[in-house]
Amino acid sequence: MGIYMSQIVVCAMYKFVTLEDFEAMRQPLLDTMIKNNVKGTLLLANEGINGTVAGTRESIDNLLAYLKADPRLVDIDYKESYHQEMPFYRSKVKLKKEIVTLGIDEIDPNKICGKYVEPKDWNDLISDPETVLIDTRNEYEIEIGTFKNAINPHTENFREFPQYVDENLDPKKHKKVAMFCTGGIRCEKSTALLKAKGFDEVYHLKGGILKYLEEVPKEKSMWQGECFVFDSRVAVNHDLEKGNYDQCFACRMPITEDDKKRPEYVKGISCHHCYDKVTEKQKARFAEREKQSQLAAEKGFSHVGDEAKKLAQLNKQKKQQAKEAARKKAQQ
């Protein structure tokens, strides 16, 4: 496909593995990202590593080689897609208690989790009438795409998933449960939760939705809609190309071109999801940010990340030059 000729490689990765020295790993990893001009965010915790980054083919290969040099990460799970533009603005490595937040300390996928199902075998599993298929992602992600017949838990964040399980699932009644998420990390931790609660047959999609879209032909696919991603692309289609959604700056919800025509939508300030939830103070702040973004765009800069720093430095230099010119004029 043509997208493979694009310049930017977007790489989503994770691995549940005990990293007792995760704090010491942070700076060398960040230095490697910066050296190779890899942008995005990686999370480190005692339970493993997780994140999405982007860069040129060479820079991503260099980062993966660096990670795989650690025997604990030699088989790190990663999925790649492609984009014409850099979808991230900064290079960040954060230290966390969990690499994906469930909020239950005793749940450890390194000790127990469900059975991996390869993308090529996923259709057979979820077509089984005995299988309970659950989308472990958030409400706003599910709204724009999911698998046929998947259950929506209606959660706003992953921390709410344990409550959904307690209130809606029963190991005696639901004998066969299959779960999925964007890249595989949330559903892997979800299977650990269900196994801990006594569920027997628990399955999860290896590599998540992104791997399924990559490996399963569109004509055989049971995926419906687009897949939400946590970067400036907002969503990708079945070809892993940027989809038809943008994102509201105020609430981060995905929005369509039709949504932008609604009266509640004001670029950079509000949309129909949040117009009645955003305070006037917030709207004023968002309006100022949008103004600065427009000014930055006119100068050929982005308003965030490294380019914002360049713009700030440029403005500072201009002010200093103006002050110096005024001082010299006053001395004449």
From Swiss-Prot:
Annotated family: Belongs to the TrhO family.
Classification via InterPro entries: Rhodanese-like_dom, Rhodanese-like_dom_sf, TrhO, TRHO_N
SMART domains per the UniProt record, alphabetical: RHOD
Protein's organism: Francisella tularensis subsp. tularensis (strain SCHU S4 / Schu 4)
Keyword line: Oxidoreductase, tRNA processing
Enzyme Commission number: 1.14.-.-
Keyword DNA repair: no
Purpose: Catalyzes oxygen-dependent 5-hydroxyuridine (ho5U) modification at position 34 in tRNAs.
Domain Rhodanese residues, every copy: 127-221
Broad EC category: oxidoreductase
GO molecular function: oxidoreductase activity, acting on paired donors, with incorporation or reduction of molecular oxygen
Pfam families: Rhodanese, UPF0176_N
Active site: residue positions: 181 (cysteine persulfide intermediate)
Catalysis: reaction(s): uridine(34) in tRNA + AH2 + O2 = 5-hydroxyuridine(34) in tRNA + A + H2O
BP-aspect Gene Ontology terms: tRNA modification
Keyword Oxidoreductase: yes
Biased composition (Basic and acidic residues): 321-332
Name of the featured protein: tRNA uridine(34) hydroxylase
Chain residue ranges for the region called Disordered: 308-332
